[in-house]
């Protein structure tokens, strides 16, 4: 027996301690000092659904999509109440997990989390962001374990650092979207996929890790319905890679279909279709804008299939042309595709990359139909989950090429220089933006931070609109997700035409939940090209640009809303103009409202 025990490397301890210190600093800084509130409509929508679940109201929503209401009305063959309206748009896992945390912190109590007069950021926004950030940090840990098993701890450490300093990852982590939950679940799934590949290459039974991977893929599909395309890639791979052939694939397929079956039966009972309102997102990829169809009460007239094939090809090409932004902006990640040409010596590494490629290809096919963009925080951004493992293959391939250079062979000190260069280059977007963001955060720390304005200004909704509108009434708005989340009131997405508006307005009146008014914000006039407003808001164009006309002239005499003959009936119903934030956010009320305490601007 040897008297020597393995020596503890102080360098490793120092490096890991430094990593954890930086990780904690970035986490606390982003969640508290630099946080600007939620800025994604889908994130706010899921958050308010989670709050309803925490209150014991089930999977219900306070954001009413006219298309969803029409579906429910047709399915029930009668008028459907706006209160406790059941949602069929979102996948259930993220709202359920968020609801558990909100229940724990008392997030269902509106009074407990009411904003103070000095606050600019809604307190529950930070809770939502913290949940998403927690999943992001867990994903870093899982990927470190996976990559160190596939390659080595050095490559795993580089990938962990790249993830930590990735601006795109932090953007999604703070958005409240389910992408970080998806990243963690996908990372867990492919960890067990690799374990199964290892077992198969060694002649052992791969059933257990392959099925465990299937469990995580099932959870993944419940976090975002589009991830079924990722699971499809795994099912195809498993059908050929693991013996006995087809057994694992069939088991995984059954695991996915069982919970999916319950969801589809639930959706059918509410909307009359097993895919609920979610299937209408297909219009985003094939027929113009998802927003257009969600805001209409006449679904048959809004599917424009002109140029269908060209739209699919365009989105497919977009995914390849903008592959770097899709892969979180990590410039080395696309080297994964070149590494497919390299003959890795270890069979599991060589086989694993084909599994990743197959899952990525099926995902790209799905997104070609449903649409995706690298700009902003796209809720359909699924390529993001592939970024860490593709980065690992890219770093490994670069390391192989680097190690074969003559000057590197002759100068051992240069052995890890390529890692340093990659980390610096990929971290620059985050590092360069930090000084300005930190400075702004420090200046506004007493007010909780700087809001995501335009178009969102939580105080106007949480402090003013909530006080104006009784809980029993509904609000029409161009940002119903924000009204539902911040004002905690039922909000209907403003239809584009007067006929659709009047149908929903009359339904609300018949249900003793008469609309209190119409809220216009920068979500309509400020986030669109001026030429696009008439096509998106049609009969309500004059109302949408009404506030801007008055701001430009400095007088209410230039109002366009009450001079529009198309809206005469609407003007009579909602004649009182209430500035919630000057005329940047205007509430057209059915009753006169005192507004002396509303600010003129953010």
Residues covered by each model-derived region:
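Transmembrane alpha-helix segments characteristic
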Residues: 158-159, 163, 212-217, 251, ...
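Perimembrane helix-loop-helix junctions
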Residues: 3-7, 197-199, 229-260, 264-265
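Hydrophobic, aromatic-rich transmembrane alpha-helices
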Residues: 238-239, 313-354, 360
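Signature aromatic-anchored transmembrane alpha helix within multi-pass, membrane-resident enzymes
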Residues: 12-23, 207-215, 231-236, 253-257, ...
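Hydrophobic/aromatic-rich transmembrane helices and adjacent perimembrane loops
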Residues: 173, 178-182, 187, 220, ...
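Membrane-interface transmembrane helices that cradle and orient dolichyl/undecaprenyl
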Residues: 189-210, 220, 238
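Membrane-embedded, lumen/periplasm-facing catalytic core of multi-pass transferases
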Residues: 34, 38, 413, 420-482, ...
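Transmembrane-helix signature of polytopic, membrane-embedded enzymes
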Residues: 109-125, 138-165, 183-184, 204
